């Protein structure tokens, strides 16, 4: 017979009472009705908030987007292969946020800020909401500092300032990403943090960009956010907001930042896919009604902050891909109306050998003029007009048999100006080099150089200035002004290089 020991029973009871936890946890739990195509319908989440993070039974995360009478429509931020009908879903009470901090520099992350470059976890202590409010009017300052891209055609004719939103738009394979990467490379030693967001691209293309930045020492001040083509639509939709949040962290610390969204057409397509699967009513081109708001709330986060806010800035270079040069389609017109100007790349110019293939006639920078450095502003004033007139005359001259001398001269100069602005990929130029090249073309100092030698002239002039006239480069780089002395040095250098080239051509 088992003997009952009262002291043992009382000891167990005391232990149980001591260990008793009075805290009551309340969780908002529902169950999956249907799942498929990256969308889950959940029943029972009565208290769910719009945009709230949901946690599924298999660990997959989702975002509540549609709050309906009897169910919640959620998008999955993962494959969700372990989610079944009837499995439980828990509302976390949190909005999606990403880790931010200095440790992100040099890393490749996904849309949730998790490392995907095989270098281990990123040690950050701070997080930031993926969706956050854009700075208000009082917190901003007008754009007044230049953001040099290193591409002569842009810095001379379509200048971009820190805090500006400048759209890069064009057909596929016209060099849109090349301009963005060159801009990142040109920020070396400029104390600027760059964030490159790749949306819906091939993993090989992203790996190529990372390798280019690493080889040229630009990865040290850059963060890559990648949502590849194979990833769920929800992650492709979130990637630009993640990039903006990472850049915002540095902006509010007083740093200058640059964010490239490559490209927002694919983000809009991902958002359209999600919206249609959630049974939201389609609008023009089957995009949902709030696709404009989707882009405007992202691009409004770019700003030049006031002195009281720390003087930081976020410059945004969104990229949009057009179909057969149609800039009047829905998404291109939306983003053109949101941004402060656009750089239009033409496939015809690209195929004719003009790289970068910028169509000067319809490219514009609405606020960048105030930020342009005086040195280049003074000499490049007529450049855009001359090139636009040249394009018009060139089209007209195809039908005219005999042209007067002034028209002929304008055509010849236009050809040389166009050649001067050619620039190979991954070779951004410093301000002094741009000033020298544009000055030579606009002032007509290379009219004697054969058209096929203009690219050689450009290269040799830069080499001559570096080796023989370093004082010119130093003065322009430091003072950002062209003094009469510097102009005299430049004229001598140009005539020296021109005479050498003309002699060799003869």
From Swiss-Prot:
Chemical reaction(s) catalysed: ATP + H2O + 4 H(+)(in) = ADP + phosphate + 5 H(+)(out)
Amino acids binding ATP: 170-177
Keywords: ATP synthesis, ATP-binding, CF(1), Hydrogen ion transport, Ion transport, Membrane, Nucleotide-binding, Thylakoid, Translocase, Transport
GO MF, any single term: proton-transporting ATP synthase activity, rotational mechanism
E.C. no: 7.1.2.2
Residues carrying the site annotation Required for activity: 363
InterPro entries found in the cross-reference section: ATP_synth_asu-like_sf, ATP_synth_asu_C, ATP_synth_asu_C_sf, ATP_synth_F1_a_nt-bd_dom, ATP_synth_F1_asu, ATPase_a/bsu_AS, ATPase_F1/V1/A1_a/bsu_N, ATPase_F1/V1/A1_a/bsu_N_sf
Similarity field: Belongs to the ATPase alpha/beta chains family.
Assembly information from the UniProt record: F-type ATPases have 2 components, CF(1) - the catalytic core - and CF(0) - the membrane proton channel. CF(1) has five subunits: alpha(3), beta(3), gamma(1), delta(1), epsilon(1). CF(0) has four main subunits: a(1), b(1), b'(1) and c(9-12).
Described purpose of this protein according to its UniProt entry: Produces ATP from ADP in the presence of a proton gradient across the membrane. The alpha chain is a regulatory subunit.
PANTHER family, per the entry: ATP SYNTHASE SUBUNIT ALPHA, MITOCHONDRIAL
NCBIfam families: atpA (TIGR00962), PRK13343.1 (NF009884)
Name of the protein described by the UniProt record: ATP synthase subunit alpha
Organism: Parasynechococcus marenigrum (strain WH8102)
